[in-house]
Amino acid sequence: MNSLELKYGCNPNQKPARIFMADGSELPVTVLSGTPGYINFLDALNSWQLVRELREATGMPAAASFKHVSPAGAAVGTPLSEEDKKAFFVDDEGELTPIACAYIRARGADRMSSFGDWAALSDTCDERTALYLKHEVSDGIIAPGYAPEALEILRSKKHGKYNVIQIDPNYVCPAVEHKDVFGITFEQGHNFSKIDRDLLGNVVTKNKDIPEAAKIDMIVSLITLKYTQSNSVCYVKDGQAIGVGAGQQSRIHCTRLAGSKADTWWLRRHPKVLGLHFVDGIHRPDRDNAIDLYISDEHDDVLADGAWQRIFAEKPEVLGADEKRAWLAQQTGVTLGSDAFFPFGDNVERAHKSGVSCIAEPGGSIRDDNVIEVADRYGMAMCFTGLRLFHH
């Protein structure tokens, strides 16, 4: 099949709509279930590139959770701790496969933003991954293949309307790509820049020690940024994004946004949060919303009389400001990536507040000396990659 008609474009009034191969070749994607739309395919094709590159760069299964053409989260398939399982709502005792761990981590980066996400897997979707997705609110998935039992589970989701796309893993896009804006065609070379350990050799700080785990986290952050709407900053820990700041005009606002998401990720692991007792039958999105309010300054919205009884089996204690500050101060070993240089040292100051110890950014600012000075003040290791990763 060379062309696929779509219901509409970005909005219902934008018709006609389709995807097609301009060179007359066959589409490298097959719809196995549902009727994916225009934005679904944008998410699918961007997220597939991300997980494919993560797989190639790390040698580990990878997954992403996309919303509006940017990743809410991305991760490689390292095992989950018992604390991870509680935070990510892994309710059963079944063994988790690496690809299932990758998606659970990717979605767990920012569960609020991943509501109604597009899932992407670097490897065949197995039954364990499909079972986890079955209980999440999601729009669709792309993968290079599906185990029969996994496909059966996914096809039953959303009363048979869940979008399932299979992509040819051997497909390679053309070297030159085109995009029309206001009737004018833009042409550029595809971004084939390779992100691997070779990119991390120019360490510009006094601290030259970048542990192997941090190098993997740098790779995860940079590949995630490669497919995130610019400007963008990404915080990573233990092989998973824990905060993505996307599409901000100001670099410091990217760093603050991603940092606040990383803080939320860490606060969800506070003993008071992991110990919350919810009423029977409450769905995961409602739990996510309740936790988000509980750890915020608006906690009265879920703790007031008449409110908490609808959510919790017993009234939780307030998670106070001092408790949150003390807990956040324990966050360490975080890696940060930026899709372009830091123009001021304030970005490093903000990163430090969320436990960042290693940074990867292109360098090239006229204030690089100031940025390095601030990193040195906190004993961080920072490398200049020389590679900008804008994505639009």
Annotate each language-model stretch with its function:
Residues 1-196, 214-232:
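Active-site loops and adjacent core secondary-structure elements that bind or stabilize anionic groups
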Residues 57-65, 164-167, 230-237, 267-278, ...:
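Flexible, glycine/charged-enriched surface loops at secondary-structure junctions
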Residues 72-112, 242-344:
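Glycine- and Gly-Pro-enriched alpha-helical subdomains that act as flexible
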Residues 220, 228, 235-238, 245, ...:
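Nucleic-acid 5′ end/cap handling module spanning
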